[in-house]
Amino acid sequence: MAATAAAANGTGGSSGMEVDAAVVPSVMASGVTGSVSVALHPLVILNISDHWIRMRSQEGRPMQVIGALIGKQEGRNIEVMNSFELLSHTVEEKIIIDKEYYYTKEEQFKQVFKELDFLGWYTTGGPPDPSDIHVHKQVCEIIESPLFLKLNPMTKHTDLPVSVFESVIDIINGEATMLFAELTYTLATEEAERIGVDHVARMTATGSGENSTVAEHLIAQHSAIKMLHSRVKLILEYVKASEAGEVPFNHEILREAYALCHCLPVLSTDKFKTDFYDQCNDVGLMAYLGTITKTCNTMNQFVNKFNVLYDRQGIGRRMRGLFF
C-alpha cells in the first residue's frame, strides 16, 4: 500500500519535497521530466536518520554521511527497500568512496537479500551541489544510471525532507555536463514497517501525545530505580557517618537498615547459579558461532582463490602441450 510522500505528512502536492534553501542552479537540470517511478520504503529513511544521528553523537557535530540504496527494479518502476552505510575518505576536499568496502558489504547483503540489487546512493545535507556530482560520478562507475537520495536533517519544514534525483547529461557551453533531475516518489510500506513507524511516531521528542506501552514501562522503572539509588545512598552515608562518630548512633535506624539488607534476594541460590551459567553458555556459544562463521568465510575465500590458481595452471599446461 503506497501513499504519496506529501499525503503521508498531511500536505498537498506530489512534486519533490521542499528544502530550506533554493536548489543550486549549476547542478540542477531545468524542464526535465523524470524517467522512472520511485517507491521509497520508510526503513530507508529510518536507516539514514539513524546513521546521521550516530555520527553526530560520535563526532559532536553534524556530519555528512554516505550510504548505498538497494531494492528492486522492474522496467521503469524502482522500489527502494533498504540501505547500508558506506565508508568514504576526503582527499583535497573531495569525497572518495571506498569501493572495496562497498563490494564487501554488497556480497554480505547478497547472501541475505538475494533478490535486492544496488540502485544508487544517499547522503545528507542541503540542496545538491557540485560535491554530490563528484560522488555520483564514482557511483556511476559501479552501476549505470544510479539514483541519488538526499535527506536534510536540519530542515524546519513539516514536509518530509527527502529528495530523490537521477542524473542527466546536458550540453553547457559546448561541453557535456552531468546534472541532477528531481524525481517524484511515493511511500511504500509493509506490515512490519507500519508497526515500526507507528512506534516511532508515538515517541515524540517533547513527550506530549501518546507514548508506547514499552516506553511508559521503562520510564516507570527508571524513576523507581533512581529513587531506590538515592535512598540507598542516603542510608550508606548515615552508616559511614555513624562509624566515624560524626552523628550519634540511632539503634532503631540501624536495625531497620539491617532488616532492609536481609530483605534483598540472596544471589547464591542454586537457581541463580543455573540461570547464570546458562546465560554465560549462551553468550559464549554465540561468540563461538560467530568465530566459526568468520573462519568458514576465510576458508571459502581461500578455496576459491586456490581453485582459480589451479585452473590457471591447468590451462597453462594444456596450452604448452599443444606446442608439442
From Swiss-Prot:
Keyword Nucleus recorded: yes
PROSITE patterns for the chain: MPN
Domain MPN: 38-171
Top-level lineage group: Eukaryota
Localization: Cytoplasm; Nucleus
GO cellular component, one term: cytoplasm
GO biological process, one term: protein deneddylation
Record-linked Gene3D superfamilies: Cytidine Deaminase, domain 2
Keywords tagged on the record: Cytoplasm, Nucleus, Signalosome
MF annotations from Gene Ontology: metallopeptidase activity
UniProt keyword annotation of Iron present: no
Family: Belongs to the peptidase M67A family. CSN6 subfamily.
Assembly: Component of the CSN complex, composed of COPS1/GPS1, COPS2, COPS3, COPS4, COPS5, COPS6, COPS7 (COPS7A or COPS7B), COPS8 and COPS9. In the complex, it probably interacts directly with COPS2, COPS4, COPS5, COPS7 (COPS7A or COPS7B) and COPS9. Interacts with the translation initiation factor EIF3S6. Interacts weakly with RBX1. Directly interacts with COP1 and 14-3-3 protein sigma/SFN. Interacts with ERCC6.
Function, as annotated: Component of the COP9 signalosome complex (CSN), a complex involved in various cellular and developmental processes. The CSN complex is an essential regulator of the ubiquitin (Ubl) conjugation pathway by mediating the deneddylation of the cullin subunits of SCF-type E3 ligase complexes, leading to decrease the Ubl ligase activity of SCF-type complexes such as SCF, CSA or DDB2. The complex is also involved in phosphorylation of p53/TP53, c-jun/JUN, IkappaBalpha/NFKBIA, ITPK1 and IRF8, possibly via its association with CK2 and PKD kinases.
Protein name: COP9 signalosome complex subunit 6
Taxonomic source organism: Bos taurus
Gene label: COPS6
